[in-house]
Amino acid sequence: MGKPMTASPQGKSFRQSPPPSRVEKAELGPGLYLTATPIGHARDITLRALDVLQGCDLIAAEDTRVTAKLLAIYGFAKPLTPYNDHNGERERPRLLAKLRAGARIALVSDAGTPLVSDPGFKLARAALAEDLPVHAVPGASAMLTGLMLSALPSDRFLFAGFLPPKGGERRTALEALKAVPATLIFYETGPRLAATLADMVAVLGGARASVVARELTKLHEEVRRASLAELAAHYADAEPPKGEITLLVGGPAGKTADLEQLDRLLDQALPFMPVRAAADLLADALSLPRKLVYGHALARKDRQDD
């Protein structure tokens, strides 16, 4: 299709000038740039992330070898320094000193969004505590990619990161999450996956809809959807899977449906009843905690008043 034509005052036609670019490369100012990188497919990087990685003075990386390979794919190199759980206490003061001096530092994890199950949050928190500039450069996330592919409810979800490696502590953590009326999202390692699924069946029950997603956006991506019991049985007899794993578990049976029903009934009741009265009535009718119902009622009332 050709470019649109516009009539000139003399009746002749001419081609419109292209509109000014709305994605012009901005000059990189000082500060800490929390920069997301791909979780697998190298093209899943943003233009802004490339601008930051090319324009910064230093990249603080969870593993400098991994980040160096990533930069080589895009055809450039930058000074790298390791920043991880092992050296964070030692490196943080040095990086903060550079930020105070006006340096432009990009913080990256090995894959995905930094600060999500990642050691970088202490550096970001320390920089913010000193009123140093901190910028988010959003992008890929295994947690959200897994949720997108899971077919589980996405209106309410809770990211719980890695569960404890020891069985007793892991089961205690799962007990605390048992009644959460939302999709639960975890990261897990291949060697621990079978034991984690077995503990989930024991604590959460085997009927919950669940998903094991691994190697997301990579060549050997696998998304396995089944009940917790079926997944536990499969991985109990299988070799430990390789690659990064995102584990998703549906909320407790009935709870999500109860909350959806609660919101519908609140929308009907609040135009005619005070918030407290509507909350008390529906908490009794649906056998839900009064505090939870009152919180929903306040939120629905605010939405109606907007």
Predicted features along the sequence, with ranges:
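Glycine-rich, flexible N-terminal cofactor/catalytic loop recognition
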Residues: G2-D85
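A glycine-rich beta-strand to alpha-helix segment
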Residues: L99-T145, P191-A195, A277
